[in-house]
Amino acid sequence: MSELRPTKPLEGVRFILPYGGEDYPEQLMDIPDPPKKLYGIGNPQVLTCGLSVIGARKATPYGRDVAFKFAKIASEHGVTIISGGALGCDSAAHRGCLEGESPTVVVLGGGCDRIYPESNRDLFQEVVDKGGAVISEHQWQFPPMPYTFRARNRIIAGLSRATLIVEAGLPSGTFSTADDALSSNREVLVVPGAITSPTSRGANRLLYQGATPIVDEETFEDVIFNLYGCLKVQDMRKKEIGETSLLFAALQAEQLSIDALMEKDDIGAPLREKRLAWLMVELAKLEHLSLIHISEPT
């Protein structure tokens, strides 16, 4: 693995975030042994409290389908998906997030100019092109090695408010990410699998040890709502309500004041142009769709 030749560099804006710097992710400061620097390509603003989705590299069709499905659901709720870019469940999670139209973050084991696996280069470029980021704690040309993949798992868990484990055998490197999540006081969610499936033995063991089970879409949406404050999409599709989708996405992602909404790049311009009248109309639409509830002033 250390003899991998450098791949064609990803195209995009490059950034370096030193520990304690203005744009360094605050949630990483709380983990044991936070990275001294983050090197990245893409948008550093997406390194917020997302959801990590991980699982087996040699995933079954079930594992890949579930990773894609739940990543897409979370993405449709405005949640950023964070994973390691590996084959199998990781790749499926990144693709599901892109399908749901939210940005996704790839945390590499080597430097950002040493793409691994090389077969995922086009996927990583799409991640960058669609507003996400590819990051590493190592310098650009640092080669991926077995120990660097174990070490990067703490970053995947640390950037996330919760970690969803889709498939994991015994033994499994996925357990290290679960351990990192628990040591950083993050939630561990697990999708159960057949007890006869080798790729689900580790996941089922984590459930036995007390991880939160995710058994269907409804339980997943409930957990997403509780962890991220996201509103349920129900039968509404963002594109069907025009400009209201901008407001809806902003409200899903975080609780914001009117002033804070105006500062957001994607929705600030419409707000500044149309001001309060537009805002009240759009909020009324969302309430009519039963997506939000506007309480009376006390």
Where are the predicted features?
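Glycine-biased, small-residue-rich flexible motifs in mid-sequence functional cores and linkers
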Residues: E3-S295
